[in-house]
Regions:
Chain B
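A generic local secondary-structure boundary/capping motif
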Residues: 41-43, 52, 75-76, 94-96, ...
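Glycine/serine-rich anion-binding loops at beta->alpha junctions
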Residues: 83-103
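A short glycine/serine-rich beta->alpha loop
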Residues: 89-95, 113-116, 325-326
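Short coil/turn connectors at secondary-structure junctions
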Residues: 47-51, 58-60, 81-84, 100-101, ...
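Short, surface-exposed beta-strand-loop junctions and turns on beta-sheet-rich folds
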Residues: 70-71, 111, 318-319
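Intrinsically disordered, low-complexity regulatory segments enriched in Ser/Thr/Pro
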Residues: 188, 196, 297-326
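Catalytic beta-strand/loop module used to bind and position nucleotide/cofactor moieties
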Residues: 96, 100-221, 225-228, 253, ...
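Active-site loop/lid in soluble adenylation, ligation, and acyl-transfer enzymes
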Residues: 2-73, 77, 89, 189, ...
């Protein structure tokens, strides 16, 4: 397990969504999504990250991306219905980035929610 | 007091959880590997209890870990010669050779009454396969989080994943080990590397038969395993049958997914820049790294234990076994390979 604190604390406007994810709204209506520090600690040292395909739309919870640590694969879905805009290539190339900097360089993907209000409805505490 | 009762007494109270046990027996590779995916969906929906599946494949096949790349992992010449299917599992870990001399156990369970998932569940549930093996005369131990070993040699590989709203843990016991197939199936950048890989597999992977001189019957192993889950305080189980919806889902969705070439050939993961061109985990911390040497047509091969280089080779350019030259420790070439290994994330 990764026990070191995150090197970069959450920035302004970063909110939890669901038990494992955070999101940060961008000016263009998209949101950046990542794994919370607590979730990356639970997962342990990540060996693989396969991001969701940019341009593809998913329903909330539908398996869209995967993470692997210690031979255990988590198949994760998007927190709300939406379309993936980008996947973080740095996290795919070096999944350890997610452990080292979960709120910064280790973001997972950027998406455009189908119904922006869905995010607000599911929003957790500000991190 | 039976062996299992002695274990139960040492572990504590009788487990309250009642699971279903599906024994698929000998069956084709897709069913042996992937029926549990169909089961997981029923478990997640609350249609059936958490479930233990046992099975024995009736033919050999190659199983890719979920994040492994078919095009980068598998030697196509081997596939053409052996004509075996390649199946991608939804769980983690590396590429494995599976055949009728291996016995499978698989768990599909809900988070709320089975466990949170993740590597800690591997450690918890694998107490039972260890206990069953020991009662049948195999002195297995758990090398956390996911290998059963005898001494330092792997006799069982295990992995897990979250699928369709449930958790799946899969594992198998090596009754006999086909070391040649295990090494020949791997795609390698130079033929001289294959003998090095085979030797390391022979050194690190053992089998039930090699350790004890004989093999218990599948049924005896299965029954001991079922009892061990109870005796270890994990769950009791009752024999059951697949539901019609599980059979239908398996035929129409699970099998179709595994027969779809786009599922087998998921795109390879992006690679970090650096000298490592091939990373082969053999067992636990043991493996090989193949490295490119800048400005030459040679490759370096490091046989590693974690980040420690145990042996190093310079490979190429001649083809065949003659292409590999073992490097003496203390030489510049050895040191160069050791430096590259130290800077690599390894088998994190």
């Amino acid at each position: 397990m990764s026990s070191a604190p995150p090197r970069v604390p959450p920035g302004a406007g970063v909110c939890a969504i669901g038990p494992d994810l955070w999101y940060r709204p961008e000016a263009d209506g998209t949101v950046v999504v990542g794994l919370t520090d607590a979730a990356q600690r639970r997962a342990g040292a990540l060996a693989h990250y396969r991001g969701p395909l940019p341009g593809r739309s998913f329903r909330a919870g539908e398996p869209a991306l995967s993470l692997e640590s210690e031979k255990w694969v988590g198949h994760l879905g998007l927190p709300v219905d939406g379309t993936v805009v980008a996947t973080n290539p740095a996290a795919e190339t070096d999944p350890g980035t997610i452990n080292r900097d979960p709120y910064g360089a280790g973001w997972l993907y950027r998406m455009r929610p189908r119904v922006p209000a869905d995010l607000e409805a599911r929003r957790g505490p500000v991190l | 007091m039976s062996g299992h009762d002695a274990i139960a007494a040492s572990v504590g109270e009788e487990p309250r959880a009642l699971w279903r046990h599906l024994d698929l027996g000998r069956c084709d590779p897709v069913r042996a590997q992937a029926f549990v995916e169909s089961v997981a969906e029923s478990v997640a929906a609350g249609e059936v209890p958490n479930t233990l599946v046992t099975a024995q494949p009736n033919a050999p096949y190659v199983s890719l870990g979920f994040h492994q790349s078919f095009s980068e992992e598998i030697d196509e010449g081997f596939l053409a010669r052996r004509r075996v299917p390649v199946l991608r599992r939804v769980e983690g870990g590396g590429t494995t050779w599976l055949d009728p001399d291996q016995w499978f156990y698989q768990l599909a369970y809900r988070e709320e009454d089975g466990g949170p998932g993740g590597p800690a569940d591997l450690v918890r549930f694998l107490r039972a396969p260890v206990a069953a093996a020991r009662l049948l005369g195999l002195s297995a131990e758990l090398r956390a989080p996911s290998d059963l070993v005898v001494g330092d040699r792997k006799v069982s590989g295990n992995a897990g994943g979250d699928w369709a709203g449930a958790h799946i843990l899969v594992g198998g016991v090596l009754g006999r080990a086909d070391h040649r197939a295990m090494s020949d199936l791997l795609k390698l950048p130079h033929p001289a590397i294959r003998p090095i890989v085979r030797e390391e597999i022979e050194r690190r992977v053992t089998s039930w038969e090699a350790e004890t001189g004989s093999l218990p019957a599948y049924a005896a192993w299965r029954d001991h395993l079922v009892e061990a889950f109870r005796a270890q305080g994990l769950f009791r189980s009752r024999p059951g049958r697949p539901t019609p919806s599980e059979e239908t889902r398996f035929r129409t969705e699970t099998t179709a997914r595994h027969e779809d070439p786009s599922w087998r050939e998921l795109p390879p993961a992006a690679k970090a820049p650096g000298p490592v061109v091939r990373r082969l985990r053999i067992a636990g911390p043991h493996g090989l790294l193949v490295l490119s040497a800048t400005g030459t047509d040679r490759l370096g091969v490091a046989v590693v234990h974690g980040a420690t280089v145990r042996e190093a080779y310079a490979v190429g350019p001649p083809a065949g076994r003659e292409g590999a030259r073992r490097l003496a420790e203390g030489t510049d070439e050895f040191a160069e390979i050791a430096r590259a290994v130290a800077n690599d994330p390894g088998f994190a």
